[in-house]
Amino acid sequence: MKERLQQLQQEALEKIEQANDLKALNEVRVAYLGKKGPITEVLRGMGALSPEERPVIGALANEVRQAIQSALEAKQAKLEQEEVEKKLAAEAIDVTLPGRPVKRGNHHPLTRVIEEIEDLFIGMGYTIAEGPEVEKDYYNFEALNLPKGHPARDMQDSFYITEEILLRTHTSPVQARTMEKHKGRGPVKIICPGKVYRRDNDDATHSHQFTQIEGLVVDENIRMSDLKGTLREFARKMFGKDREIRFRPSFFPFTEPSVEVDVSCFHCGGHGCSVCKGTGWIEILGAGMVHPNVLEMAGFDSKKYTGFAFGMGPERIAMLKYGIDDIRHFYQNDIRFLQQFHRV
């Protein structure tokens, strides 16, 4: 029995050494230490031994079993390490190979224009205010001097979610909310950039979703001349230092008086061309003095405080600045269009 156990140990150790992979090693494990293996058979046959032989053979069988188990574990660790090394060698990166340059990204032209406008007004002491795109009817209309049934509401077809909730049609609600937060105390000096929504049919100059930037200043002794000076400064920084602006009478329910603002054509210098349609002027935004009703509804004393407001579309500014003839180009994600602005 002793010779048999010693022979089994020697055979098992030799086969463990010869195993070239984990599968072969597992076959050796099952062959020698499995339920039907020779070591197990020896242990089962110990009942036939004499009482004197039984402890000696039992101890030897356990030693042989432990020796084989230890050899299996050592060989398994070695084979696993070899597999890791082979995998690392196969996946090695040759750092001497020339790298692939990362493709250079760029800002969308609308993002460029919006950030440029924001920077201009921040430089003039304005802060950026934001508000919800899903807005209450009150802030979108009533707080801006557009009560229910007002005929001017027909100027904007709106996306209503419920009777009192809609997608905002302009960023003016942000002005109303900001004034309300000030609780009747000035000054207020903000710009409000953001997305707006109207039920327009998409074409070269209209989109159901577009962006607006509106500005608001409320304080004591604010005059029309302050509005004109602000917009002249904006036009010169945005379109060139020689630009002039002009006001044309207009109507907006939330301002009185209201004006359309034109800038002298930056393509022809005001002499007349196809861009300005021969007039020498290009319309860029609407503006006016804040209506007293709007001030009062926001909690301001209209006899003490005055203010001006203006609103522009970054899409129109970008179309004029970069010579883009169709607003839909901004939203189609056409790489041929967008890659033109890498160095703009």
Curated annotation (Swiss-Prot):
Protein biosynthesis found in the keyword field: yes
Names of the cofactor(s): Mg(2+)
NCBIfam families named in the record: pheS
Keywords attached to this entry: Aminoacyl-tRNA synthetase, ATP-binding, Cytoplasm, Ligase, Magnesium, Metal-binding, Nucleotide-binding, Protein biosynthesis
A biological process term (GO) from this entry: phenylalanyl-tRNA aminoacylation
EC number(s) given by UniProt: 6.1.1.20
Coiled-coil regions listed: none
Name assigned to this protein: Phenylalanine--tRNA ligase alpha subunit
Record: residues binding Mg(2+): E256
PANTHER family found in the cross-reference section: PHENYLALANINE--TRNA LIGASE, MITOCHONDRIAL, PHENYLALANYL-TRNA SYNTHETASE
GO cellular-component term (any): cytoplasm
Gene from which the chain derives: pheS
Subcellular location: Cytoplasm
InterPro entries xref list: aa-tRNA-synth_II, aa-tRNA-synth_II/BPL/LPL, Phe-tRNA-synth_IIc_asu, Phe-tRNA_ligase_II_N, Phe_tRNA_ligase_alpha1_bac, Phenylalanyl-tRNA_Synthase, tRNA-bd_arm
Assembly and interaction partners: Tetramer of two alpha and two beta subunits.
Molecular function GO terms recorded: ATP binding; catalytic activity, acting on a protein; magnesium ion binding; phenylalanine-tRNA ligase activity; transferase activity; tRNA binding
Pfam families hit by this protein: Phe_tRNA-synt_N, tRNA-synt_2d
Cofactor note (record): Binds 2 magnesium ions per tetramer.
Major enzyme class: ligase
Catalytic activity: tRNA(Phe) + L-phenylalanine + ATP = L-phenylalanyl-tRNA(Phe) + AMP + diphosphate + H(+)
SUPFAM superfamilies for this protein: Class II aaRS and biotin synthetases, tRNA-binding arm
Organism: Geobacillus sp. (strain WCH70)
Protein family membership: Belongs to the class-II aminoacyl-tRNA synthetase family. Phe-tRNA synthetase alpha subunit type 1 subfamily.
